Structure formats: structure tokens, C-alpha cells
Amino acid sequence: MVTNDELEKQAIEDRLNAATSKWSGFYVVAFLFGAALGGLVFGRIGDRFGRVKGMAASIFCYSGMSAVAYFVQSPEQMWVVRFLVCMGVGGMWPNGVALMSEAWAGASRPMLAGVIGTSANVGIFLTFMVFKMKDVTVDDWRWVMLLGAVPVFLGLLVLTAVPESPRWLADKQAHEDGDDPPEDESEKPPDEVAAWEVFHRPLLWVTLVGILLATVPLLGGWGSSNWANFWADEVG
């Protein structure tokens, strides 16, 4: 016979599981939209003030906000802080790719993007190894936020030791002198296209197909990778 205590305990567990699923979804959304906005904001900073400064600002954003996350007291606070953290993560990508592609003009851009993407996975693997040595529990998880704050030292290193993109410096100098930016045939696209033009013919269909091809793997990848752990817990 099921007692009242057991029923109450089961009801509490059901509510906690529902809340966990809800906030997990919110945190994934915060990551995706935060990264998208961060790419725009910090990408603009990189265009205006230099790739190195844009990259350093991105690192300071996600590491500094990770430190702030150590002090959160509610899921809502964590949601906001995670959004800001992910803005920094999203800002690192365009500035890093731009700096590498402009510094190594002869290298393949897809290859450089792949190197950065692979490096991110290496970081995830190293974090997993840390978790193997120290458990993350309900009562002991805030140290993970401090671990995320460690890259602030990397931001300082970027500011002091990483040289600015020679292409960006040349464009800036040409702009200050009132001259046309130096042209590099390996970097110059066949046609200069404004951002809004990709949503008009004849580029509209190409844009829509590109969005569709990017959406499908993102939905499948994020949908499966972020919910797999919760499904595994429910199964066994």
C-alpha cells in the first residue's frame, strides 16, 4: 500500500523534473540567442576597434559573467547571466575566424573555422575530464562557474601578446588617409553585396536554401545533444 509520504515524495519529484526540463530548455535558448546576438555585437566591435580588441572583449564577457554566475540565487538570475555568457561565446567566433583568416590570408577559411570548432570540442573534453576528478552535485556546483572564469587570463594574454590583423590595420590606415582600402585578390569577393540584398532576387533562393541547410543540423544536433542526458536518466 502506498503511503501519503510516498505520494507526497513522488509529487515533489515530478514537479522538480518538470522544472528541470523547463529551465534546461530556457538555458539552451539563452545559449543560442545569446551567441547569435554576441556575434553581431562583438563582431561590430571587432570591425570598429580591431579583431584583437573584439576577441579580448568577448573573452572578458564570458569569463566575467561566469564569475558572476557563482553568486546567482535563482533560475531566473542564471538564465540572464547565461545569456550574457553566451554573448561572449558567440562574439569569440567571428573575431577569431576573422583574425586567423586575415593573418593567414593563404589558408582555407573552412579549414580555419574547422580548427576553431575542433578547439572548442577539445575544451569540452578537458572540462569533462575535470568533472571525472570532481563531481558536480546539487550542493556543490558553483565551483564550475569559477572554472569558467579562468579564461579572463587568456583575455589579458590576447590584449598584450596577440598582434592585430595586418589586413584590418591596412584598412584602418587607408580609411584615415582617405584612400581606398588595399585590395587583396585572394580576399576580395567576386561581387560586393549588401546584407539586405541576400533577401532579394536573384540571391533570395540561395539564401533560403542556405538557411534551411543550416537549420536542420542545428535542430537535430542541439535537440539530441542537450536532451540526451535527461532522457538517459529517465530510461535508466
Q: What are these language model-derived features?
A:
Residues R201-G236:
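Extracytoplasmic gate region of multi-pass secondary transporters
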Residues R142-L159:
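Symmetry-related core transmembrane helices of the 12-TM Major Facilitator Superfamily/SLC fold
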Residues V81-T118:
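Cytoplasmic helix-loop-helix junction between adjacent transmembrane helices
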Residues M1-L37:
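Extracellular/periplasmic helix-loop-helix junction of adjacent transmembrane segments
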